[in-house]
Amino acid sequence: MPKMKSHRGASKRFKRTASGKLKRSHAYTSHLFANKSTKAKRKLRKGAIVSAGDFKRIRNMIAK
């Protein structure tokens, strides 16, 4: 059986932290910034941690 390939799209979107968690970026950051407050835009710049419900599925997608 051939080796499993990692999901290339997921590999580009998620990074593993030193403690083993998965880091992601926020959505709603590509355009339409005039409708968003400065506070909302500032919060969107920060990264976020993948939730526990999605962790296992995404971990399997990016496993090499």
Swiss-Prot record:
Keywords: Ribonucleoprotein, Ribosomal protein. Residues 1-26 have a biased composition (Basic residues). It comes from the Bacteria. It holds the Pfam family Ribosomal_L35p. GO terms for molecular function: structural constituent of ribosome. One of its GO terms (cellular component) is cytosolic large ribosomal subunit. Residues 1-42 are annotated as: Disordered. The keyword Ribosomal protein applies. GO terms for biological process: translation. InterPro entries: Ribosomal_bL35 (IPR001706), Ribosomal_bL35-like (IPR021137), Ribosomal_bL35_CS (IPR018265), Ribosomal_bL35_sf (IPR037229). Belongs to the bacterial ribosomal protein bL35 family. NCBIfam families: rpmI_bact. This is Large ribosomal subunit protein bL35. It comes from Exiguobacterium sp. (strain ATCC BAA-1283 / AT1b). The gene is rpmI.
